Swiss-Prot record:
<dbReference type="InterPro" id="IPR006674">
    <property type="entry name" value="HD_domain"/>
</dbReference>
<dbReference type="InterPro" id="IPR022971">
    <property type="entry name" value="YfbR"/>
</dbReference>
<dbReference type="GO" id="GO:0002953">
    <property type="term" value="F:5'-deoxynucleotidase activity"/>
</dbReference>
<feature type="binding site">
    <location>
        <position position="137"/>
    </location>
    <ligand>
        <name>a divalent metal cation</name>
    </ligand>
</feature>
<feature type="binding site">
    <location>
        <begin position="77"/>
        <end position="80"/>
    </location>
    <ligand>
        <name>substrate</name>
    </ligand>
</feature>
<feature type="binding site">
    <location>
        <position position="33"/>
    </location>
    <ligand>
        <name>substrate</name>
    </ligand>
</feature>
<keyword id="KW-0378">Hydrolase</keyword>
<comment type="similarity">
    <text>Belongs to the 5DNU family.</text>
</comment>
<feature type="binding site">
    <location>
        <position position="137"/>
    </location>
    <ligand>
        <name>substrate</name>
    </ligand>
</feature>
<feature type="binding site">
    <location>
        <begin position="18"/>
        <end position="19"/>
    </location>
    <ligand>
        <name>substrate</name>
    </ligand>
</feature>
<protein>
    <recommendedName>
        <fullName>5'-deoxynucleotidase YfbR</fullName>
        <ecNumber>3.1.3.89</ecNumber>
    </recommendedName>
</protein>
<feature type="domain" description="HD">
    <location>
        <begin position="30"/>
        <end position="142"/>
    </location>
</feature>
<keyword id="KW-0547">Nucleotide-binding</keyword>
<feature type="binding site">
    <location>
        <position position="69"/>
    </location>
    <ligand>
        <name>a divalent metal cation</name>
    </ligand>
</feature>
<dbReference type="InterPro" id="IPR039356">
    <property type="entry name" value="YfbR/HDDC2"/>
</dbReference>
<dbReference type="GO" id="GO:0046872">
    <property type="term" value="F:metal ion binding"/>
</dbReference>
<feature type="binding site">
    <location>
        <position position="68"/>
    </location>
    <ligand>
        <name>a divalent metal cation</name>
    </ligand>
</feature>
Amino acid sequence: MKQSHFFAHLSRLKLINRWPLMRNVRTENVSEHSLQVAMVAHALAAIKNRKFGGNVNAERIALLAMYHDASEVLTGDLPTPVKYFNSQIAQEYKAIEKIAQQKLVDMVPEELQDIFAPLIDEHAYSDEEKSLVKQADALCAYLKCLEELAAGNNEFLLAKTRLEATLEARRSQEMDYFMEVFVPSFHLSLDEISQDSPL
């Protein structure tokens, strides 16, 4: 049986730090970011279905979010100001991402590729799926800013402002619900979020 390097590559996502040009109180890697995005995307999909008449597969959304940055194991995490410096760079980077996504799919044993390709290749996402994952991705970046600012790191002030504009552009009913119900707790200390539920 032929060996595959697919999961050995994915395990290296934990070695790629996000926010590489920013001073961080706590470094965040792509692996842990992907898990948080998967949890938030799943929540957004569940909220959409339960509260706002949606009909999306919340489990699939979680899987798409889990793999949404997988290609960065081959490309690295390009800082946002560089990635979107101009439309030409953004377009070229998208092409590089597409090549990296295909390279990852090609690492998967052939008999499993039809399972993993639709998770890794973002061109297989529906518009609704893509929107939910992008909302979750932006929300998690925003939450990172809140955590850094709460720790006294003003380096993230401008990033927070930019992400607020991104969130406004991607705004949805499910995002509004998430922002109202879950986000305020990120401004609180461990003692404050623990006082209502002692062990």
